[in-house]
Amino acid sequence: MSTRDRNSVVVGVDGSDSSKSAVRVAAELATERSLNLKIIHALDFAPYGFGGPYMDSGGVYEWVEASGKAILAEAQEEAFAVNPIIDVYTELSIGSSAQWLVDLSENARVVVVGASGAGAAATALLGNTAINVTSHAHCPVVVVRGDAHEGGPVVVGVDGSPTSERAISVAFQEASLRNAPLVAVHVWSDLGPTAFEDPRAAALVPQGLEEDEHAVLAESLAGWQEKYPDVLVTREVYIDNPRARLLAWSKKAQLLVVGSRGRGGFKGMLLGSTSNSLVGGAHCPVVVVRPARP
């Protein structure tokens, strides 16, 4: 997950089991890459009417701040359990955790978030945070969910777009670091997002189009296998719905890597929808790679 002189992994925490898992993953990433770890917690005053008449009564601010500090201290201990000598920095702030993570992503190597929070409302909130961060961050975002199936492959979704090229780069780096095989999956459904729900629809594919799609995958991978000769690569091309195929692969992958935007127009919207679906439903951790900034 290389980017220009960024030397930190940033993780957002809320005290939930999901965020504890995110801290462990973030600490592992930081350790493997010799980076420092920044753990952040956004103070949430919404339940107490931030700025309202109850804000200053009963020591609400002090209580929420103390709770936030305790969450950060516990997260720091989680990180030290992974690596006792890791460089860890913690910080509290008031406001939107999603916006804060997006701001910090400007200078981070990678941002890590959990996929669910503490309780139903928090789970919905953290899920929204994950979607917002993966949609707007300036660096790759790891959404920790499901199981990192030990011994499974790193799986990357490929569609031939510039963002997909960045996802391929991240996927090869991760596969090499993890000594894992890489599965490059190209799923196309140019006849529309629901066209291939009926298996008979495959007969509608124009002659030669399937060969063109195999060429898209081959061209996308050109040069990468030479750069990473240690990575065993398997290529898979499907005429299907991208979301369904990638979700199926997530059941046996240790990591799923996708771009957040596709080839533009309809396909761009489709891949954006696909990445959001994976953030919300994949069975393994997901890395969402953002487009290059103009």
Model-based region annotation:
Residues 1-5, 18, 59-62, 77-111, ...:
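Structural beta-alpha unit
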Residues 2-58, 153-207, 225-236, 294:
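Small/aliphatic-rich secondary-structure junction motif
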Residues 19-22, 26, 30, 105, ...:
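Small-residue (primarily alanine) positions within well-ordered alpha-helices
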Residues 33-36, 86, 139, 180-181, ...:
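Short glycine/serine/threonine/alanine-rich loop segments
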Residues 57-70, 203-213:
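A short acidic, glycine-rich active-site loop
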Residues 112-115, 140-146, 287-290:
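Short beta-strand elements of ligand-binding domains
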Residues 113-132, 151, 255-281:
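Glycine-rich, Arg-bearing micro-motifs that act as flexible, cationic patches
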Residues 128-147:
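Short, structured interface segments
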